[in-house]
Amino acid sequence: MRIRVDLKVDEIPRYWYNVLSDLPFKLDPPLDPKTKQPISPDMLSAIFPMPLIEQEVTDKREIPIPEPVLEEYAVFRPTPLFRATYLEEFLQTPARIYYKYEGASPTGSHKTNTALAQAYYNKISGTERLVTETGAGQWGSALCYSGAKFGLKVNVFMVKISYEQKPMRKYLMRLFDGDVVPSPSEKTSFGKSILASNSENPGSLGIAISEAIEITLSDSRTKYSLGSVLNHVLLHQTVIGLELKKQLEVLGEKPDVILGCHGGGSNFGGTVLPFIPDKLSGKEIKFVACEPTACPSLTRGRYDYDYGDTAGMTPLLKMYTLGKDFIPPKIHAGGLRYHGAAPIISRLVKEGLIEAVAFDQDEIFSAAKLFAKLEGIVPAPESSYAIAGAIREAKKAKEHNIPRVVVFNLSGHGLFDLTAYI
C-alpha cells in the first residue's frame, strides 16, 4: 500500500530557518572583486534589494515568512512525503526509503520556494525588472512564474546547451511573460566576447551569471536574482526540511541518511540544514550531497575564494570550486553544471558534517528509469543523482542487514526532460 504523509495547509512553516545561528563557527566573508577586502552590505545594493542583503548576513535563527509569500506557498505547499515501498521491494532491502516530492510546485521543482520570496522582496523594494541565469530551466521557469505573480518583468539567460536540449522550459518561461535567450548571447559585451573566441561555446552557469549581472548594472530599476549558492537562497529553501521534520515525526521515523542532488546547493541545503542541529547535538545522522562526476565541485574542487561567475564580476566566495573558467561537459542535468558550491555547504563539507559523492550519468539514468517504472514519477535528471545515492545506501543496508531510514529530496519532475531518457 502506498504510504504518504500530507500536512495541512496551516502546517506550512511560518518561518525560514537560518543555520548560521547554530553553527560553532563563522563563515569567511565575501570579498569585493576589486579590492579583495570583505564586502559591505551596502556594496551589494547595486544588484540585490536591501531585504535580501539583510537575510544574506543575518545571524537571526528564524526569519518570518511574509504573508503574501505564504499565500503563494499555499498553492502547492506543504509538499508530500512518500515511502518508496515499490523500490524497497525491488531492491529487497531492509532499509525504509522516503522521498520528499518538490515536483508538486507550479513549475515542477523546488526553485519556486525562493523565487516567490525573491520576487516579493524585490517588488516591495521598488524593483521593476529581474534578470537571472538558468541552467536546465527550472530556476528560470520559477522566477518567471513568480515575477508574473508579483508584477515584475523577468529576463533570463539560459545556458545554451540546455536551451537547445530542453525547449519546453523556454516555452514555459515565455508562458509566464519571461524573456529568455541562450547564453552566451549577443545581448551583452561579455557574451559577445565569449562567442568571438568560440561561436560553438555550449555555455555555463558562470557565463550566464556574468551576462545577467552586466545587464543588472546598466539599469537602476533592475536587480539580479540568483537561484542557488547564496545564504538567502538556501534560507528560503529550508521550508523543505522543516516540513520534512514534521512528516517524519508523524511516522515516528528518525532519519539515518538524508540525501539530495547538489549543483549550487539550494535543494540539498534546504533539505538537510534544518537537521544540522541534530547532528551537532550528537545524533547519528549522515548527510550526502550527490553530484555529477562531470562537474565534481565538492569531491574534486579546491576549497578557496573564487568568483561566482566567469567574468569575475561577483564577490569572491569561500567555497569548493573547479575554477570560474571551468566549462562542464554537456550532461543532461543542466542545473548541476556549476563550477562552485554554496559557502554554507562547502564549509559543512570541510568540517566533516556533510559527505559528498559523485555519480556518472549512466548510473543516474538507470536509477531514474527504475524509479519512474516503480514509483510512477519521472524524475528530473538533477534529482536522479539523489535517487542513485539512495539506492546505493539501500544496498549497503541490505549488505549489512541493517534497517536504516534513508530519506532523499526528489527536487523536481522530468516531464520537460524526456529527450534525456531516449
From Swiss-Prot:
Reactions catalysed: (1S,2R)-1-C-(indol-3-yl)glycerol 3-phosphate + L-serine = D-glyceraldehyde 3-phosphate + L-tryptophan + H2O
GO terms for MF: L-serine hydro-lyase (adding indole, L-tryptophan-forming) activity; pyridoxal phosphate binding; tryptophan synthase activity
Pfam families membership: PALP
Pathway: Amino-acid biosynthesis; L-tryptophan biosynthesis; L-tryptophan from chorismate: step 5/5
Cofactor: pyridoxal 5'-phosphate
Entry GO CC: cytoplasm
PANTHER family in the record: TRYPTOPHAN SYNTHASE, TRYPTOPHAN SYNTHASE-RELATED
Entry function: The beta subunit is responsible for the synthesis of L-tryptophan from indole and L-serine.
Subunit structure as annotated in this protein's UniProt entry: Tetramer of two alpha and two beta chains.
Family statement drawn from the similarity comment of this UniProt entry: Belongs to the TrpB family.
HAMAP family: Trp_synth_beta
Entry protein name: Tryptophan synthase beta chain
Gene name per UniProt: trpB
